[in-house]
Curated annotation (Swiss-Prot):
GO terms for biological process: iron-sulfur cluster assembly. Signal peptide: none annotated. The gene is hscA. This is Chaperone protein HscA homolog. It comes from Shewanella sediminis (strain HAW-EB3). GO terms for molecular function: ATP binding; ATP hydrolysis activity; ATP-dependent protein folding chaperone; unfolded protein binding. Belongs to the heat shock protein 70 family.
Length: 620
């Protein structure tokens, strides 16, 4: 007899069957993979009991090495050994070369200005390199868990933009792995601590990794993780501490032009010194030169602190801005969570504690907390915990909008809006008979397009040729849970539509985002004045165009004196419209409107006469 398995739609017929999914912290310096096993989330070690994997890839003439093997050869073969590739994701070659000094790589530019690394295996891009880091982590997970993965959650800095997020997803796609979600690193940390402690209130997530810094202010309430505000710097991390010490030691030893191998060796030594100073008051730095000479120098904790103080203070300034954005005072923060290996630096903990007024939480290993949170989220998304009521609400770092006539920005989705989100706004045509409309999608807080960042352009065709202002075009902005944007424009009467997914060729650094926010505040008064001027100039152009068309059609209804008076008022508006005086333009528009009142009445009377011509009183 045949047996039928019956299950609820969308659920497995075997409820006990555990689906395999993992969380991956794809870090700048190190990467980790974690999974939920027997209800407990933890990172997965390799066969040598090492939990982390160095985010390093080496390309040789015989193959590709990743992780510890690549790290072992990085000093001897720096040109073919790519470290901290996360810092290059979604950035142009020009940005990289201007922002990061002393890079040993042989760069080439792709057709759209993105960086290519020339290696023994040919040219490779950051997406391909990131894929090589993911590969051993996924292999480790599948061998440990005993099966193929149904999906992964990858963590990214909260301030990663569309290009950086898409590049991260593409790295997994190269391996044929399904990405269940890109999860902001601070949010992942909140998941790990929130589920462990069950606390409710405002929490600050201070995430200082190898190459990026993020501060997120979250409200935890009944299973809801709402990000109130975010901030940070995608080009500031522990690597920068290493580079400062590296530069200081070169000066101490009077080395002006080190070879690539010596420079890489010293960078590795600088990192070791930094780590030792976490527990010791001083350590001796050592460097072996190409001629066999060994150099030494004692580095004290106070010296190291003096080198990095300005950078750590920059992170505290970001915390202050994030709190202001969230409308929260430092003493209202319930807990501060430290994330990232660089938070082990004593000066970092000291300044963070001083700012928030309380000792930060460190009960979960700061190196592993993000991966653990990602594993918990992966376990939920793959369907192993259908009863979970955990809800994540991330936010947009910058406003998204559309260019309107006069180079103005109409914001559709505001900064700090929770995502995923879909918002729509209606626009209309500017000219009679207009059958197409060009859309310019921009990002930023300023009032004029020239001061914002261009994201994409697309055109909607097939609009019915109606009078200006008669067509209704609904523009919908949709940002998914990964922070990727799609924009759709639809003409409501016909249903004709056009859309675009925004994948900019390269992204903004968090320093640039912070600069944009500061510029918007510093120029707010001037921007409003410029916007008012532009709005009046657009209105003047619209009035003149509409009136010119009316005169061409019904000018015979006017006497010569009446027409002359209107044309004189039009000439005044044309002259004033070219000036930078919004009030004068507004007054000229009002004067022209007053001079055309009789003309408008005559046109209305004439239209009624034409409509009633030939009809009897009884038929009306």
């Amino acid at each position: 007899m045949a047996l039928l398995q019956i299950a609820e739609p969308g659920q497995t017929a075997a409820p006990h069957q555990h689906r395999l999914a993992v969380g991956i912290d794809l870090g700048t310096t190190n990467s980790l993979v974690a999974a939920v096993r027997s209800g407990v989330a933890d990172t997965l070690p390799d066969e040598n009991a090492r939990h982390s994997l160095p985010s390093i890839v080496r390309y040789t003439d015989t193959g590709i090495e990743a992780g510890f093997e690549a790290e072992a050869h990085s000093a001897k073969d720096p040109q073919n050994t790519i470290v901290s590739v996360k810092r290059f994701m979604g950035r142009s070659l020009a940005d990289i070369q201007s922002g990061i000094q002393d890079l040993p790589y042989r760069f080439q530019a792709s057709e759209n200005g993105l960086p290519l690394f020339a290696t023994e295996q040919g040219t490779v891009n950051p997406v391909q390199i990131s894929s090589e880091i993911l590969k051993p982590l996924i292999s480790r997970a599948e061998s440990t868990l005993g099966g193929d993965l149904e999906g992964i959650v990858i963590t990214v800095p909260a301030y990663f933009d569309d290009a950086q997020r898409q590049g991260t997803k593409d790295a997994a796609a190269l391996l044929g792995v399904k990405v269940l979600r890109l999860l902001n690193e601070p949010t992942a940390a909140a998941i790990a601590y929130g589920l462990d402690s069950g606390q409710e209130g405002v929490i600050a997530i201070y995430d200082l990794g190898g190459g990026t810094f993020d501060i997120s202010i979250l409200r935890l309430n009944k299973g809801v993780f709402e990000v109130l505000a975010t901030g940070g710097d995608s080009a500031l991390g522990g690597d920068d501490f290493d580079h400062l010490l590296h530069h200081h030691l070169l000066q101490e030893w009077q080395i002006d032009a080190p070879s690539a191998s010596v420079s890489r060796q010293l960078l590795i030594e600088s990192r070791r010194v930094k780590e030792v100073l976490t527990d010791e008051s001083e350590v001796t730095a050592t460097l072996l030169l190409d001629d066999g000479t060994t150099l030494t120098h004692v580095v004290t904790k106070s010296l190291f602190d003096s080198l990095i103080t300005s950078l750590v203070k920059k992170t505290v300034a970001s915390c202050r801005r994030a709190l202001r954005d969230a409308g929260i005072k430092a003493d209202e923060v319930l807990e501060t969570v430290l994330v990232g290996g660089s938070t082990r630096v004593p000066l970092v903990r000291e300044l963070v504690e001083g700012f928030f007024g309380k000792a930060p939480l460190t009960s979960i290993d700061p190196d592993r907390v993000v991966a653990i949170g990602a594993a918990i989220q992966a376990d939920i998304l793959v369907g192993n915990k259908p009863e979970s009521d955990l809800l994540l609400l991330d936010v947009l770092p910058l406003s998204l909008g559309i260019e309107t006539m006069g180079g103005l920005v109409e914001k559709v989705v505001s900064r700090n809006t929770t995502i995923p989100v879909a918002k729509a706004q209606e626009f209309t045509t500017f000219k009679d008979g207009q059958t197409a409309m060009a859309f310019h999608v921009v990002q930023g807080e300023r009032e004029l397009v020239d001061d914002c960042r261009s994201l994409a352009r697309f055109t909607l065709k097939g609009i019915p040729p109606l009078a200006a202002g008669a067509a209704h075009i609904r523009v919908t902005f949709q940002v998914d849970a990964d922070g990727l944007l799609s924009v759709t424009a639809m003409e409501k009467s016909t249903g004709v539509q056009s859309s675009i997914q925004v994948k900019p060729s390269f992204g903004l650094t968090d320093e640039e985002i912070g600069s944009m926010l500061k510029d918007s505040m510093a120029n707010a008064k001037d921007d409003i004045a410029r916007r008012m001027l532009a709005e009046q100039q657009v209105e003047a152009a619209r009035v003149l165009e509409t009136l010119s068309a009316a005169l061409a059609k019904d000018g015979e209804l006017l006497t010569a004196d009446e027409r002359n008076a209107i044309e004189q008022s039009m000439a005044v508006l044309v002259e004033v419209g070219g000036q930078d005086d919004a009030d004068a333009i507004e007054k000229a528009i009002e004067a022209l409107d007053a001079s055309t009142q009789d003309f408008a009445a005559k046109r209305m009377d004439n239209s009624i006469k034409l409509a009633l011509k030939g009809q009897s009183v009884d038929s009306i």
